[in-house]
Amino acid sequence: SRKSMNKKLVPLVISFIFGFRMLGLFMIIPVLALQDDSYSNFNSFSLGIALGAYGFTQGILQIPFGIMSDKFGRKRLIYLGLVLFTIGSIVAATAVSMEQLILGRAIQGSGAISGTLLALLADTTGERIRSSAMALVGMFIGIAFLLGMTLGPLITEFYGMNRIFELTASLGIISILLVGAFIDEPKSITKNLELDIELTSIKSLFFDTKLSHLYLSIFMLHLSLMSFFLILPVMLTEDLEHSQQMLPIIF
């Protein structure tokens, strides 16, 4: 039946959605620091804000999106997140100043559906295949990183930075279509409708000493990754005098 077929495809569809979103983000990382001629008011501070705006809104809204998906359904919140991601990509594609680019990146990040997608994956997969489904998501993110580091410099060199955001918006639209075609709202969702209980649970997560090591490790990993790919392209092109066309090969 269609429903059983869709259920089998859910892990693959969620992996594609993760991959599409991350591809659009990874393509930007190695080239944004080199776009000083593309945007007005470009400086080191505005560059850092533009890169960090996505993660800032993503981090703030991740838990609210998860709570709302418990109350209003996974599919609705995934739609909302992908629409925001697509709108943010369009805003960034049309940006001519760093302020506009920062706004676009912040809107992109406000579609904080990573947790909701993983919750949907847990809702629709049995315990036997759940680990494999999670591994599939990780594999697609890894492929997106590889492609993003390669395609980003190539697209920017030949077509311009705005084409990356246009491609990202297109991937957002494709993701919306995939959700409509293959994702059904799960019948059973683990819900906690008492807001005060939810807030207490969230507070305990922040102060859990065992989890704090994971929080710190993930924070340091992302900090070093973003810093590395922010500085390395500038070093390669300015200090070592490599052309931007060499960046895909080096990365």
PLM-predicted stretches and their roles:
Residues 55-63, 145-146:
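Residue-level signature of mid-helix packing/kink "hotspots" within the transmembrane helices
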Residues 170-189:
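C-terminal membrane-cytosol helix-exit motif in multi-pass small-molecule transporters
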Residues 60-96:
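Conserved MFS/SLC helix-loop-helix module at the cytosolic interface between two early adjacent transmembrane helices
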Residues 19, 88, 99-112:
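Hydrophobic core of transmembrane alpha-helices in multi-pass small-molecule transporters
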Residues 104-141:
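Cytoplasmic helix-loop-helix junction between adjacent transmembrane helices
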Residues 30-44, 231-246:
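Short amphipathic helix-loop junctions that connect adjacent transmembrane helices
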Residues 7-32, 210-227:
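Pair of pore-lining "gating" transmembrane helices in MFS-fold secondary transporters
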Residues 5, 184-216:
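Juxtamembrane intracellular "pre-TM" segments in multi-pass secondary transporters
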